[in-house]
Amino acid sequence: MKGIRLCGSGAAVPRLRISNDDLSGRVETSDEWIRTRTGIAARRVADESESLTSLAAAAGKQALERAGWDASSVDLILLATSSPDDLFGSAPKVQALIGAGSAVAFDLTAACSGFLFSLVTAAQYLRTGAMTRALVIGADQLSRWVDWDDRRSCVLFGDGAGAVAIEACPAENDGLLGFRLNSDGARGDCLTLAQTSERAELLPGMSHQRGGYAPIGMNGQEVYKFAVREVPAILKQLLADTNTEPASIDWLLLHQANQRILDAAAERLGIAADKVLSNLANYGNTSAGTIPLMLHEAVSDGRIQSGQLIASSGFGAGLSWGAALLRWDGPTS
């Protein structure tokens, strides 16, 4: 079996920045209330000139540039998203915008765990030798599905995209040292973007369901309890699987959902606060975009260096959660 090399990163966010003070003009809230409970100061929201597809393509192009690849060399594009521009899939459109005509492209939906699930999925194609190069993109435009009059949820989410270019390599240079993935549909009702339907007449005496989607629904307390229990647990299992001591981890890269969750997970793992990567203050929760967006930012500013060990975990709706132990081997700063 081959190994996987992480070769380049990219990111894209909308131009429009919505601060906590801006939101306080629409709902009863304040900068202090939001920061204290979430760690978020602002979020980016796509306007009418931007889309999930355009953000994903921009992030993907940058990852290819940083990896030094021509788009024609990519065999696979996986787009992790829960908010596609087209329910039939947005990855093929991203493929066209990038110019990766030789790549098979498809969407993978696993909410805020989506990027990590997609990275692991893409890696399996490369490990077997079926493919050589893959582009994994995490992108969401959840602003389309937020109830902007619900102060419990509208303060949390933003739009954004991140991408990582990976390629097959000799097993001894493997950059995906281990992973674990979990799902539990029995607990899924605490975080939903659920279908709605209404009866519509099709023919006399015959009807069908006309569909749509309700705004994001969330039981914040249950989501918090789920995250602070399962994220440290799955990371501890992964570190045990790979015979890795927490002290040897250079960076903890978690899904950027809430600063309280990041802090609690790090404390339970015994990982120092200065090893916890966070950009929640600037972007909020971009769902499948958070991990690659944070990775790219830390690579670009020189925090993450080639050869460093990264413990990562994604978690969210489904419920779904996973963890991966990564070694960065792409360009930095």
Swiss-Prot record:
Record's keyword annotation contains Acyltransferase: yes
Protein's cellular compartments: Cytoplasm
Record pathway: Lipid metabolism; fatty acid biosynthesis
Keywords of the record: Acyltransferase, Cytoplasm, Fatty acid biosynthesis, Fatty acid metabolism, Lipid biosynthesis, Lipid metabolism, Multifunctional enzyme, Transferase
Catalytic residues identified in the record: 112, 255, 285
Main location: cytoplasm
KW Metal-binding (keyword) present: no
Substrates-to-products reaction catalysed: malonyl-[ACP] + acetyl-CoA + H(+) = 3-oxobutanoyl-[ACP] + CO2 + CoA
Gene Ontology MF annotations: 3-oxoacyl-[acyl-carrier-protein] synthase activity; beta-ketoacyl-acyl-carrier-protein synthase III activity
ACP-binding: region residues: 256-260
InterPro entries documented for this protein: ACP_syn_III_C (IPR013747), ACP_syn_III_N (IPR013751), FabH (IPR004655), Thiolase-like (IPR016039)
Its EC number(s): 2.3.1.180
Pfam family for this entry, one: ACP_syn_III
GO biological process annotation, one example: fatty acid biosynthetic process
UniProt family annotation: Belongs to the thiolase-like superfamily. FabH family.
Domains (record comment): The last Arg residue of the ACP-binding site is essential for the weak association between ACP/AcpP and FabH.
Known partners and oligomeric status: Homodimer.
Full protein name: Beta-ketoacyl-[acyl-carrier-protein] synthase III
Organism: Synechococcus sp. (strain RCC307)
